[in-house]
């Protein structure tokens, strides 16, 4: 059985994917971590072979603390948060050693899944064996490839370094476009339409942007470089402007 924790936008999308593409597995969705008054949730966690906490990065550690006592030996916990090094450290420090760990980042969300008709072919997914038997990890990795996913193996540290100069940058630029209230015009070029696509695909992700910056220290350098570069380009443009008449 697969136990998915979290019913936010991505949690609901993940549950739909599991029910669609892994229909032969029993799947249960938990709205929150268990407590003593929610015995069914505890029973689900004890029976689960795979547990996927699809929760915000800021609450990931607390969810791990709450589920840790109920995870059985050999249970696989798969982290699907946007940031990997921080959550990998939390899994190692908060979960018992008899639990196996996989770090995973699906590089897609509900909007892109809906646009793809909820099919996985060609979508990117980062994965890393944090603490798991090699044969079990290999079966999972190849199973994901069989679903059509483009599986990328990256350590959490490499993942976060690359993300700081890719996804973080697109989220940051999208937030700038939203704050500037950039809108479509009757004079759109193709490149401007693509810029609006960045705005539209990231306009609901400010919370993710904030968490990515908060929990990925590599983003500091990217933000500082962007600020400096914009300042340098602005200064160059103003310097190049021809003086007005007189």
Residues covered by each model-derived region:
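Rossmann-like NAD(P)-binding element
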Residues: 42-71, 76
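Short glycine-/small-residue-rich Rossmann-like dinucleotide-binding loops
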Residues: 55-57, 81-82, 130
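Active-site capping/gating segments
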Residues: 30, 102-136
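NAD(P)+-binding Rossmann beta1-loop-alpha1 motif at the extreme N-terminus of oxidoreductases
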Residues: 1-43
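Internal alpha-helical scaffold of NAD(P)-dependent oxidoreductase catalytic cores
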Residues: 120-202
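Interdomain hinge/lid region at the active-site interface
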Residues: 184-246
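Rossmann-like NAD(P)(H) cofactor-binding subdomain of soluble oxidoreductases
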Residues: 65-114
């Amino acid at each position: 059985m697969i136990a998915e924790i979290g019913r936010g936008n991505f949690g609901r999308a993940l549950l739909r994917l599991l029910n669609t593409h892994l229909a032969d597995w029993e799947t249960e969705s938990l709205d929150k971590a268990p407590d003593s008054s929610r015995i069914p949730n505890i029973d689900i966690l004890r029976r689960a072979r795979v547990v996927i906490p699809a929760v915000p990065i800021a609450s990931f550690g607390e969810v791990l603390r709450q589920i840790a006592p109920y995870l059985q030996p050999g249970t696989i916990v798969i982290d699907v948060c946007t940031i990997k090094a921080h959550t990998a450290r939390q899994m190692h420090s908060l979960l018992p050693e008899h639990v196996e760990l996989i770090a995973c980042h699906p590089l897609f969300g509900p909007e892109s899944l809906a646009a793809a008709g909820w099919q996985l072919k060609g979508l990117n997914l980062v994965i890393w064996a944090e603490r798991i038997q090699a044969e079990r990890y290999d079966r999972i990795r190849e199973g994901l490839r069989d679903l059509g996913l483009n599986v990328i193996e990256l350590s959490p540290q490499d993942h976060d370094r690359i993300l700081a100069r890719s996804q973080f940058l697109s989220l940051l630029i999208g937030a700038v476009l939203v704050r500037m209230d950039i809108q479509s015009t009757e004079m759109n070029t193709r490149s401007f339409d693509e810029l609006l696509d960045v705005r539209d695909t990231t306009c609901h992700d400010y919370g993710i942007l904030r968490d990515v910056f908060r929990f990925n220290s590599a983003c500091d350098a990217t933000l500082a470089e962007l600020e400096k570069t914009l300042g340098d380009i602005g200064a160059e443009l103003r310097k190049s402007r021809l003086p007005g008449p007189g």
